[in-house]
Amino acid sequence: MKKILLLFVVISVVACGGSKKAINSDKYTIESLQHKNYEQILGMYSDADPENGNDMMEEGTVERPYTILYPGTKDEILITWKDDAKTSIFDINYSENGKWSSATGIKIGTTYDELSKINGKEVKFYGFGWDYGGAVMWNDGKFENSKLRVFLSPTGRAADKFYGDRMIDATPEEIEALNLKVSTIMYRD
C-alpha cells in the first residue's frame, strides 16, 4: 500500500510540474496577448522594459499609439493600440527568432513548404519591397479566417519580378530557389 501511495505522490508531482512548464511556455505566444490591455500586459511581462509612443502606421495613413516590449533585443515585440488609453490591441507583431512564438506551430524561420503543410493548403504570397511585402494569403486553408498574418522573405536577393504590390505567380522551382521563410508574424484583432 505504501508503494502505491508513493507512486501516486510521485506521479502527481511530475504531472503538476509538467503543467507549470506548459503554462510558462504559453506565456510567450502571440495569442497570450490577445484581448489584454496595457496594464495587464505590464503585469504579465514586468521585465519587458516597454517603450511607448505614437507613429504613422499602415503605409503612413493612420497614427496609432504603440508599445514595444523588450526593445532592441531578439525578443522585441510591437503592439499597436486602437485607442490612446491602450485598452484594446489593434495588432501585435514580431520579426526576430526570440522567445515569442505562435500556438499554431508557425514561428520565425518556418519554411514555405512547412507553412503550406501547417495550413493544409499551399499558401500564396505578395511581392517583396513594400510595407506588406511577402504577405501570405492562406488560400482557403486552415488559417483563412484566423487573425494570424504571416510574412515571408527570400534568403538572398530575389529577381525583380518578385517585387511589388501584387500576388506572385511562381513555379515550384522558383519558390524553392527563393528559399522563403517566415520573417514576421502578426496578430490583428
Model regions: which residues?
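Long, compositionally biased
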Residues: D140-A159
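Short helix/turn-capping signatures at newly exposed starts of structured segments
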Residues: C16-Y132, M137-D140, K161-D189
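Sec-dependent N-terminal signal peptides
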Residues: I4-V13
